[in-house]
Amino acid sequence: MPTAPALGALLLLLGALTPGHQEKLFHSRDHSDLQPSPQHQAELVTDLQSAQQFLSKYGWTEPVKWEGTSSKNAAELPRYGDADLMQEGASISRYGQEFPLEPTQAPAFVEALRKFQTLNGLPATGKLDDSTIAAMNKPRCGVPDNQIGKESAIVKSNSNNVTEKASGKSLNTTTNQNPENGTSTSKIRKKRFLQMLAAPVRYKDQANQGSTVRGAFSKKLLKWRLIGEGYSSQLSIDEQRYVFKTAFRMWSEVMPLDFEEDLTSPMSLIDVKLGFGRGRHLGCTRSFDGSGQEFAHAWFLGDIHFDDDEHFTAPSSDSGISLLKVAVHEIGHVLGLSHIYQTGSIMQPNYIPQEAGFELDWTDRKAIQMLYGTCEGSFDAVFDWIWKERNQYGELVLRYNTYFFRNAWYWLYENRKNRTRYGDPVTVSLGWHGIPAEGIDAFVHVWTWTEDATYFFKGTQYWRYDSENDQAYIKDAQGNQYPRLISEGFPKIPSPINTAFFDRRDQFIYFFKDAHVYAFDVKRNMVANHYPKRIIDVFPAVVRNNHPFGNIDAAYYAYTHNSIFLFKGKEYWKVVSDKDRQQNPKLPRNGLFLKKNISEQWTDICNVHSSMLKMR
């Protein structure tokens, strides 16, 4: 245990307490790749005729009928050895229809070309120049940008304006600021932008019933499978499955849907089927064009096909086309997202090489949440973990990381980015050694002039944690063996408790049990006078009857907000701070402000399916 002078020096550094660096991930998204074996090359856009075909194919001239023309049922798929499975049909145009040999620059063509140029950050000249041809020849998704019966969500890139649809309607939305840090100049503009991203989707069969679909799937668990007829020739089967598992997990980390790989159920019960093919493939009504342009296509509520003529590589490769990035994009289509021309968005139609560590950005996360909602739920414990390190000048500084515990999982929350760490949640047993693997009741950090100790509580016991060695004590310097009974270390505190926290202002631990709270004086090692008391008496409601009353899930002092929070269910109450009372003396001490949803303050804390907790 640190000496009093040492602790005094540490406490002087509290004012400089800063969020900690990102904790190392416990599973990697990076794996080696194999070399490609392309067999066909895509035809390039080179002239007016092929440019007109391109604009028509992807819905720039007029919307394209796409949904409802997906692949056949699995039972109708040809066998793996079928000669047509991996071959390009010579009699079928790569664009699926015929065009005049000498297209004229009709007003519709010129207007479509201008729209395409604008959304690709090119001068809107309406003329087919080299830059426009180069943009058309970039590797891209095969899903049209504008579809019949479906609202598009096309956002102008590198601009201060957000363009609504391909019609050029402007929302005048600022997009060059980072929405994650909450510094957007207009919440109204941001809301309108998000509403545009999640424009209602209406299809023919649903329109007949008068229904408008905002979320593609109504159920919470989706099953997926890489079909046996459609393995890639470039990567091992295990590598392919791992990449797809990672892609589904990345979406699950930011939305309230679970994804599970299912290798045994009848194909009719599989929600999303994935496969590779060349040319005419997998019984699909659409043909792939060979290496160099269209790399995949997908259908709303349906299947995903990848062109095996493309050079697909694993995430760690700096060459070829990242299968992970393409898979994440196509899964977005299956879930209901349209193309988004927005810098950083995974839903851009063109493939853009990504640096290591690619993840879903703010636009993608908020777009999918507009369809499916945000992640909500209760937590077992929430706390800031304080640790010490020396900076580049050799000075001792204190830092903290914020953690959320639920069942057997935990998340590290990056307050500066207002989201969880990429790759979370992970299992408690993987990151916290020697404490119970699930169901933690409380975390307490006792921090005084004479004591610096951290404890985890569960049931009738508690554990002291050794932060230096990153594991629970078996026996501490005072000779105490762990786990200990709560009644031994904290006399007259009942167990099990609901939650607890240490208040540095009065140096009491507040233990919550049902509708009561116990203030424990750590200096005297006893319950404070006149306790227990009703929670509502110690933490009164600022607004009458707006109060948790009892059975608190978690109590948390947040260094980011310099405030105490009480959590119950999906909601939280902020405790009136000394600063709040200085600004408004009428506020009661330790009063509870109006409740709010946890997901409004701490975003994207999402479960993933249990099968995805261990990625390999």
Swiss-Prot record:
Binds 1 zinc ion per subunit. Belongs to the peptidase M10A family. This is Matrix metalloproteinase-21. Hemopexin repeats lie at residues 376-435, 437-493, 494-542, 549-605. A motif (Cysteine switch) lies at residues 139-146. Residues 157-186 are annotated as: Disordered. PANTHER family: MATRIX METALLOPROTEINASE, MATRIX METALLOPROTEINASE-21. It is an enzyme of class 3 (hydrolase). Disulfide bonds join C375-C606. GO terms for biological process: collagen catabolic process; determination of heart left/right asymmetry; determination of left/right symmetry; extracellular matrix organization; proteolysis. Its main location: secreted. Its cofactor is Zn(2+); Ca(2+). Zn(2+) binds at C141, H329, H333, H339. InterPro entries: Hemopexin-like_dom, Hemopexin-like_dom_sf, Hemopexin-like_repeat, M10A_MMP, MetalloPept_cat_dom_sf, Pept_M10_metallopeptidase, Pept_M10A, Peptidase_Metallo. Transmembrane segments: none annotated. The precursor is cleaved by a furin endopeptidase. The active site is at E330. GO terms for cellular component: extracellular matrix; extracellular region. It comes from the Eukaryota.
